[in-house]
Swiss-Prot record:
Function: Plays an essential role in the utilization of numerous aromatic and hydroaromatic compounds via the beta-ketoadipate pathway.
Similarity comment text for this entry: Belongs to the intradiol ring-cleavage dioxygenase family.
Annotated Fe cation binding sites: Y107, Y146, H159, H161
E.C. number(s) listed in UniProt: 1.13.11.3
Xref: PROSITE patterns: INTRADIOL_DIOXYGENAS
Protein name in UniProt: Protocatechuate 3,4-dioxygenase beta chain
NCBIfam families linked to this entry: protocat_beta (TIGR02422)
Catalytic function, reaction form: 3,4-dihydroxybenzoate + O2 = 3-carboxy-cis,cis-muconate + 2 H(+)
Length: 235
């Protein structure tokens, strides 16, 4: 049996600042006063517990979990990886949730008024549990880029949002996964707001081993919840 991981203070220099001037909305909603440290309490040492019985059989397959009258449009991809704690141990049986735009760069919600088509067979949301090795796996459609009005001719790179609790409330993480070689990364203030030394932790790796022949390209994205090598959080 693994020994419990001791939670150490977060490595804040690896994460984006709360206020990043180039990311306009962060200036409006970011805190303007110093943070007040809180003592660790019992509730911070535990997290909600989910099991396989809480999931549907197609929750992990975004290409099938919202089908109405056909297949979703776009490039099929497999996204998989391991969830690790700050000690490098796998985080087993933890819930991983994702959401994303469709292949045209459109989200399924009323606030998204981007002039791009919705896909009636694609919801853009899924979830799964990690296995005994801390591994998760999703089958989905590669999301498209979309304009977002932050600055002139601003476009978000292709990305997938991730949400995890891990074993503790103190390891809560919401982040974004990007794709290798995306030219928009150099112009995106959300990605660029992450300290340079930690940006590569947000970029998935193409994997021929994960690729399903004739069906879907594969990408690996490992997630570290805390510690010196933590995956940077989304602000």
């Amino acid at each position: 049996m693994d020994s419990p991981t001791i939670l150490t203070p977060r490595d804040w220099p690896s994460h984006p600042a709360y206020v990043h001037p180039d990311y306009r909305s962060s200036v409006k909603r970011g805190p303007t006063r110093p943070m007040i440290p809180l003592k660790e309490r019992l509730r911070d040492q535990y997290a909600p517990v989910y099991g396989a019985e809480d999931l549907g059989p197609l929750d992990h397959d975004l290409t099938k979990n919202a089908v109405k009258n056909g297949e979703p449009l776009g490039e099929r991809i497999v996204v998989t990886g391991r969830v690790l704690d700050e000690g490098g141990k796998p985080v087993r049986n933890t819930l991983v949730e994702v959401w994303q735009a469709n292949a045209a760069g459109r989200y399924v919600h009323k606030v998204d008024q981007h002039d791009a088509p919705l896909d009636p067979n694609f919801l853009g949301a899924g979830r799964c549990m990690t296995d005994a090795e801390g591994r998760y796996r999703f089958l989905t459609i590669k999301p498209g880029a979309y304009p977002w009005g932050n600055h002139p001719n601003a476009w978000r790179p292709n990305h997938i949002h991730f949400s995890l609790f891990g074993d503790y409330f103190g390891s809560r993480l919401v982040t974004q996964m990007y794709f290798p070689g995306d030219p928009l990364l150099a112009y995106d203030p959300i990605f660029q707001g992450t300290p340079e030394a930690a940006r590569d932790r947000l970029i998935s790796r193409f994997s021929l081993d994960t690729t399903e022949e004739g069906h879907a390209l594969g990408y690996e994205f490992d997630i570290v919840l805390r510690g010196r090598d933590a995956t940077p959080m989304e602000r």
